[in-house]
Curated annotation (Swiss-Prot):
The keyword Transmembrane helix belongs to this UniProt entry's keyword annotation: yes
Taxonomic path: Bacteria, Pseudomonadati, Thermodesulfobacteriota, Desulfuromonadia, Geobacterales
GO CC aspect terms: plasma membrane
Function (record text): Part of the high-affinity ATP-driven potassium transport (or Kdp) system, which catalyzes the hydrolysis of ATP coupled with the electrogenic transport of potassium into the cytoplasm. This subunit binds the periplasmic potassium ions and delivers the ions to the membrane domain of KdpB through an intramembrane tunnel.
Organism: Geobacter metallireducens (strain ATCC 53774 / DSM 7210 / GS-15)
UniProtKB keywords: Cell inner membrane, Cell membrane, Ion transport, Membrane, Potassium, Potassium transport, Transmembrane, Transmembrane helix, Transport
Entry keyword Lipid biosynthesis: no
Major site of localization recorded for this protein: membrane
Cell compartment(s), UniProt: Cell inner membrane
Protein name per UniProt: Potassium-transporting ATPase potassium-binding subunit
Name of the coding gene: kdpA
Length: 586
């Protein structure tokens, strides 16, 4: 790394960590119903929404009612977005006259945005109208993020409360999250992005002449269906427009990741400068990191929140260092051709290698899935870093809400295993960890992984799925594994060599996204409900301290062991084999 890259990365981390505590404390006040600096402005809006929707803010829910509310709300969201996509050609704000989506693509896209995955089997600038982008996709960026945060807050209450079955009110949590957290920060973020050159308009697409016409041979079929080429001359180009900045801010803040354009955050209209790149990474990481502080405040043990933050940050830092190192080493096959230096294929020069690596780690360590570099163009070991971060469950630091509750499931497993090793009843924050909590934690941690391995195996023996791969061999397997890992873990990024707009991937991918989103969410709510009913057990001499460095290291070891046991065979056949092949000169 150059001195500039060291300075850039260090300043970014210092700024990010500086806002973790105040942001975490602010969110704790919001979800505990305490007064904040935004209360004079937003409390009337909040109360009005409750009256319109018939919500009793003082009525709380047990875990079953909370889970049902989550599922029903997301079902309603799915129906609304599916209808918008299927009726796109009849709705306003469609200056390019885009047709309706096919039902398979509409199904996949609606589920994708409802589950916070934002997997896109289409190109935004050539398929989605402005109405679809704003009323459909951008709105769901807010509510899907709010859903994940609400579930995390309910889980925190499960650890904090004693001898009660109540976890809060989903409608209140979601409303407060949207009004007090997501909307204000998104507004500020959008204004900053506009200042950097991100576009925000509802203009028609612009057709402009090229300075010099381009002539090339385009493949086509003759009258008998035989492949031939035809000479084509291009004299002008169409430049897409749209309300990008407003969607870009919540896309990153809510760890959604669905791009307005096909190139996502590598597109100069979404991410034009190194400053906008750092702003977007900051938005991606802000809430996942700050929620650890919120957790510490709400359970009355801030050291515990910092311990969890430390594990997340260490895993992310190691991933960044490894990715930066292997990409700096370059590709030996390219070096043989006389092109030495770092691997800059698929990366934006305006961001540099460090900016690209940091964005890659941030977007796959969370459930964001936005991309500022082409993951398919990373070296084999470089590509294994984002793939590995996704497969581990996106806990470094994870998506908004989902990252924290998945990490807490790992904490429960780590406490349980450590308790068995020292012959003590496992306890965490004064709550005994028993069989029910372990089962729910295992479901939370392994649900997505089971889906990934099963569907990847099915894909490798299905002709349509195999034909969708652009690459054979180990890299082709990596593309398939990455696709299902991304969908099942609600990430949304991809190795772009895979054609995902075929029935196999749109339908089975939809199933993967649903299971990966809602199975863990319901499981952790059940765990939280069980914990909330338990009495508090004061710490004794035999209690394992979970807010110290030894336990933090033990937690990270448990995470890596679970990930290695689950996915090492698949990774061995994919990126590891590809790396050895590359070293062998093939």
């Amino acid at each position: 790394m150059t001195q500039y890259e060291w300075l850039q990365t260090t300043l970014f981390l210092v700024l990010l960590l500086a806002v973790v505590k105040p942001m975490g404390a602010f969110m704790a006040k919001v979800f505990q119903g305490e007064r904040t600096m935004l209360s004079p402005l937003l409390v009337p809006c909040e109360n009005l929404l409750y009256r319109i929707c018939g919500v009793n803010r003082d009525e709380e829910m047990d875990w079953k009612r909370y889970a049902v509310a989550v599922l029903l709300f997301n079902l309603a969201l799915f129906v609304s977005l599916f209808a918008i996509l299927m009726l796109q050609h009849l709705l306003p704000l469609n200056p390019q006259k885009f047709p309706a989506y096919t039902w398979q693509l509409a199904l996949n896209t609606a589920i994708s945005f409802v589950t916070n995955t934002n997997w896109q089997a289409y190109s935004g600038e050539s398929a989605a109208s402005y109405f679809t982008q704003t009323v459909g996709l951008a709105v769901h960026n807010f509510v899907s993020a709010a859903t994940g945060i609400a579930v995390a807050i309910a889980v925190i209450r499960g650890f904090a409360r004693r001898r009660t079955s109540m976890l809060g009110n989903f409608w209140v949590d979601m409303t407060r999250c949207t009004l007090y957290v997501l909307l204000p920060i998104s507004l500020i973020g959008a204004l900053i992005l506009v200042s950097q050159g991100v576009i925000q308009n509802f203009s028609d697409y612009k057709t402009v002449p090229l300075v010099q016409p381009i002539t090339y041979d385009k493949p086509k079929a003759d009258g008998k269906g035989n492949p031939v080429t035809g000479r084509v001359t291009v004299k002008d180009i169409t430049i897409p427009m749209g309300p990008v900045a407003s969607q870009e801010a919540i896309k990153e803040l809510g760890t959604n990741g669905g791009g307005f354009f096909n190139a996502n955050s590598a597109h100069p209209y979404e991410n034009p400068t190194p400053i906008s790149n750092m702003v977007e990474i900051f938005l991606i990481l802000l809430i996942p990191f700050a929620l650890t502080s919120t957790f510490g405040v709400m359970v009355g043990n801030t050291r515990q929140g910092w311990a969890i933050l430390g594990v997340m940050l260490l895993m992310m830092a190691i991933s960044f260092a490894v990715l930066q190192g292997v990409e700096t080493s370059g590709n030996p096959l390219v070096a043989k051709l006389g092109v030495h230096g770092v691997n800059m294929e698929g990366k934006e020069v305006r961001f540099g290698l460090a900016g690209a690596s940091l964005f890659t780690v941030a977007t796959t360590g969370t459930s964001c899935g936005a991309v500022a570099t082409m993951h398919d163009s990373l070296t084999p070991l470089g590509g294994m870093i984002p793939l590995g971060l996704i497969l581990l469950g996106e806990i470094a630091p994870g998506g908004v809400g989902s990252g924290l509750y998945t990490m807490l499931a790992f904490v429960v497993i780590a406490v349980f295993v450590a308790g068995l090793m020292i012959g003590r009843t496992p306890e965490f924050l004064g709550k005994k960890i028993e069989v029910r909590e372990m089962w729910m934690s295992i479901i939370t941690v392994l649900a997505a992984g089971v889906v990934v391995l099963i569907l990847s195996g099915v894909a490798m023996i299905t002709p349509q799925a195999v034909a969708s791969k652009a690459n054979p061999g180990a890299h082709g397997l990596s593309e398939v594994l990455y696709a299902f890992a991304s969908m099942a873990n609600n990430n949304g990024s991809a190795f772009a060599g895979l054609n995902a707009n075929v029935d196999f991937y749109t339908i089975l991918g939809s199933l993967a996204m649903l299971v990966g989103r809602f199975a863990p969410a319901v499981a952790v709510l059940a765990m939280a409900g069980s914990l909330a009913e338990k009495k508090y057990v004061p710490p004794s001499l035999g209690t394992l301290p979970t807010d110290k460095v030894p336990f933090a290291l033990w937690l990270m070891l448990v995470i890596l062991i679970v990930g290695a046991l689950t996915f090492f065979p698949a990774l061995s056949l994919g990126p590891l084999v590809e790396h050895l092949t590359m070293l062998g000169g093939k």
